[in-house]
């Protein structure tokens, strides 16, 4: 709850403290945090490839972030900026807008920021601004939990919670000591307070501290630098999924597979200044990614779990990305209504909203006998409505991603890989041409493990299976043309786009026939006729039939991360969960430098690919990733073998 001092300066009623100096909050930020971390001098000499990463404890009104954004503009052509902030009690758009209204210098930046400051979820929320030059990760939650969830090291730290006497939880000894897990030699910090307990905790964590003149009426402030050359790893991370940082600068990457995973990854890497070779024998999005239309919404579970946590994060970033990237004719936020079904029963859906603490801005429950966007059509249909559920045309998005500068498409089959010093060679079967790159990333659907297996005596370490899906398109009827939202139940129906609906999709793990089958078309028609009889669809409405073979993992989450030797994994971790080894320290998993996989997206290719590509790009460059470390563990390529050795 906010009050306003002189109707200008925001004051927290909960902590009885001001958010920024009433004298000049913007100049205070520059003095304490920008100059306190020597950012102007450091930015002038920064590496052009790696993002400069700042961690802030206490987002508040966003003043520090927007001021940093403004000061960074002079350097935006030299490097990217990644700003991570933690906030337990976030302000809404109106409160932030009013709080920052006194700073005329920030008007345009504030406008761009607030246009994306929506659909927030507990935990990590990832944004990009300034055409991908600025990455922003906002963690909503407790600071002690958040620090254990940041995967990566930062370059500077802004400590800006309310005063220690007002908000002791943020300045707790354990919180400040955990800063070592996100620090590396040369990481700096600054803060407005010089309280003794703060200095003692930071010194204990490995920071060399120095007092400096404070801002305005504050006599002193504190700056520091992390002096330990040893990289502390988060003790909560399991040894088999601890990150390995690149030993060399990455300049070239070969991506095998030009579906939606490969093309979105090519886009993410090329925007970081990396030369990308994109390889596929069929062309861009010519296999399963070539479906005419895909729909996306988060997957709600009754209690927060791996699938719901990942898909919520992926959904909100996909919305943000596509809103600025996609042309109007291949992306639209129509909203999506999901009816109650046997699998998605009313308790699961309602408890899912409650337990994930989702606002009505994201999703709300529609009870029976209530009106809806489509008039009386769904009046007696209970379910949930995702306000920004959307449809896309995957092939169009994939092609636009592949057209970016720095992406070279090569039509051909990757037939052999071998290490060449610090690089990798990849042979193109048709031409005999060899591609040399610092890294190879396998995004080739259900063939993801085939080339890798040659390194491990033929063993494919990733359990990906084919799942057949068939969809059909339907000519609109007079009544169906009025539907404005995507409708989901056991199958889904899109609104009419240019006179055509998409009705999908079947799910078959056993019949892998690549050709359309009448029985599947009949099954889909039977569904839509029984579920929505008033729409008057019949067999004469069928326009096209399309089949795709999804690449799916046993837990229906993508495989994303470094390649490892499964033989070594079994040797090292085969007894990791035995009671006798409870206190034993196991070595970190040694991954194969320069080899990565990104696949197994299943039926959520569009939903997963945009955030997945950003995660992968961050891993390859050794930067903080835009999801929690616990979510990263859900996606790790070694998770299946870990589960197997535990049995």
UniProtKB/Swiss-Prot annotation:
Pfam families hit by this protein: DAO (PF01266), Methyltransf_30 (PF05430)
For this UniProt entry, the molecular function terms from Gene Ontology, in alphabetical order, are: flavin adenine dinucleotide binding; oxidoreductase activity, acting on the CH-NH group of donors; tRNA (5-methylaminomethyl-2-thiouridylate)(34)-methyltransferase activity
All disulfide bonds of the chain are: none
Origin: domain of life: Bacteria
Matching PANTHER family? SARCOSINE DEHYDROGENASE-RELATED, TRNA 5-METHYLAMINOMETHYL-2-THIOURIDINE BIOSYNTHESIS BIFUNCTIONAL PROTEIN MNMC
Q: Just give the chief location class.
A: cytoplasm
Q: Which GO terms describe its biological process?
A: methylation; tRNA wobble base modification
Name the family.
In the N-terminal section; belongs to the methyltransferase superfamily. tRNA (mnm(5)s(2)U34)-methyltransferase family.
UniProt-recorded name of the protein: tRNA 5-methylaminomethyl-2-thiouridine biosynthesis bifunctional protein MnmC
| Cofactor annotation | FAD
Sorted alphabetically, the keyword list is: Cytoplasm, FAD, Flavoprotein, Methyltransferase, Multifunctional enzyme, Oxidoreductase, S-adenosyl-L-methionine, Transferase, tRNA processing
What is the protein's known function? Catalyzes the last two steps in the biosynthesis of 5-methylaminomethyl-2-thiouridine (mnm(5)s(2)U) at the wobble position (U34) in tRNA. Catalyzes the FAD-dependent demodification of cmnm(5)s(2)U34 to nm(5)s(2)U34, followed by the transfer of a methyl group from S-adenosyl-L-methionine to nm(5)s(2)U34, to form mnm(5)s(2)U34.
- What SUPFAM superfamilies is this protein classified in? FAD-linked reductases, C-terminal domain, FAD/NAD(P)-binding domain
Region (FAD-dependent cmnm(5)s(2)U34 oxidoreductase) location:
256-647
Keyword Cytoplasm found: yes
- What is this enzyme's catalytic activity, as reactions? 5-aminomethyl-2-thiouridine(34) in tRNA + S-adenosyl-L-methionine = 5-methylaminomethyl-2-thiouridine(34) in tRNA + S-adenosyl-L-homocysteine + H(+)
Give the start-end ranges of region tRNA (mnm(5)s(2)U34)-methyltransferase. 1-227
Q: What is the lineage of its organism?
A: Bacteria, Pseudomonadati, Spirochaetota, Spirochaetia, Leptospirales
Intracellular or extracellular location(s) = Cytoplasm
């Amino acid at each position: 709850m906010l009050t306003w001092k002189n109707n200008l300066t925001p004051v927290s009623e909960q902590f009885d403290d001001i958010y920024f100096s009433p004298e000049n909050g913007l100049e205070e930020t520059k003095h304490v945090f920008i100059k306190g971390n020597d950012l102007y001098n450091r930015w002038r000499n920064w590496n052009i490839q790696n993002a400069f990463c700042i961690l802030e404890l206490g987002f508040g009104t966003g003043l520090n972030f927007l001021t940093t954004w403004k000061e960074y503009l002079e350097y935006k052509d030299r490097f990217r900026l990644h700003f991570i902030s933690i906030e337990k009690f976030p302000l809404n758009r109106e409160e932030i807008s009013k709080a920052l209204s006194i700073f005329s210098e920030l008007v345009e930046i504030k406008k761009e920021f607030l246009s994306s400051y929506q659909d927030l979820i507990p935990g990590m929320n990832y944004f990009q601004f300034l055409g991908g030059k600025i990455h922003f990760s906002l963690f909503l939650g407790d600071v002690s939990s958040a620090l254990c969830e940041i995967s990566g090291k930062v370059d500077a730290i802004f400590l800006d919670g309310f005063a220690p006497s007002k908000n002791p939880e943020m300045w707790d000894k354990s919180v400040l000591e955990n800063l070592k897990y996100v620090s590396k030699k040369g990481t700096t910090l600054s803060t407005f307070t010089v309280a003794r307990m703060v200095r003692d905790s930071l010194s204990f964590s490995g920071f060399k501290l120095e007092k400096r003149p404070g801002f305005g009426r504050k006599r002193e402030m504190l700056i520091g630098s992390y002096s330990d050359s040893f990289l502390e790893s988060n003790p909560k991370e399991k040894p088999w999924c601890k990150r390995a940082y690149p030993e060399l600068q990455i300049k070239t990457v070969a991506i095998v597979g030009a579906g939606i995973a490969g093309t979105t990854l090519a886009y993410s890497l090329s925007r970081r200044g990396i030369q990308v070779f994109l390889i596929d024998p069929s062309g861009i999005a010519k296999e399963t990614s070539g479906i005419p239309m895909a729909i996306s919404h988060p997957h709600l579970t009754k209690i927060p779990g791996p699938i719901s946590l990942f898909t919520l994060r992926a959904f909100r970033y996909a919305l943000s990305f596509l809103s600025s990237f996609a042309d109007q004719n291949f992306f639209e936020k129509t909203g999506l209504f999901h009816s109650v079904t046997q699998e998605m029963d009313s308790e699961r859906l309602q408890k899912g909203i409650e337990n994930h603490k989702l606002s009505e801005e994201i999703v709300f429950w529609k009870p029976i006998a209530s009106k809806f966007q489509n008039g009386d059509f769904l009046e007696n249909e209970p379910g949930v409505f995702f306000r920004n559920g959307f449809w896309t045309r995957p092939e169009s998005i994939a092609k636009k991603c592949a057209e970016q500068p720095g992406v070279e498409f090569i039509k051909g089959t990757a037939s052999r890989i071998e290490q060449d010093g610090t690089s990798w060679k990849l042979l193109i079967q048709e031409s005999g041409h060899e591609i040399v790159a610092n890294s190879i990333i396998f995004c080739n659907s259900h063939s993801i493990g085939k080339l890798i297996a040659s390194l491990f005596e033929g063993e494919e370490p990733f359990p990906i299976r084919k799942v057949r899906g068939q969809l059909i398109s339907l000519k609109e009827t007079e009544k169906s043309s009025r539907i404005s939202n995507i409708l989901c139940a056991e199958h889904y129906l899109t609104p009419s786009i240019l006179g055509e609906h998409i009705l999908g999709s079947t799910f078959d793990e056993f019949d892998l026939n690549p050709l359309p089958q009448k029985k599947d078309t009949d099954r889909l028609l039977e569904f839509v006729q029984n579920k929505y009889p008033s729409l008057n669809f019949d067999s004469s409405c069928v326009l096209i039939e399309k089949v795709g073979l999804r690449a799916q993992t046993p837990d229906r989450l993508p495989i994303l991360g470094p390649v490892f030797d499964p033989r070594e994994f079994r040797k090292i971790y085969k007894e990791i969960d035995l009671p006798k080894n409870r206190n034993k320290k196991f070595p970190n998993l040694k991954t194969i430098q320069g080899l990565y996989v990104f696949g197994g997206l299943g039926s959520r290719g569009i939903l997963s690919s945009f955030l997945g590509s950003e995660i992968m790009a961050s891993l390859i460059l050794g930067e903080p990733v835009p999801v929690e470390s616990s979510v990263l563990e859900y996606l790790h390529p070694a998770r299946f073998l870990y589960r197997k050795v535990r049995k």
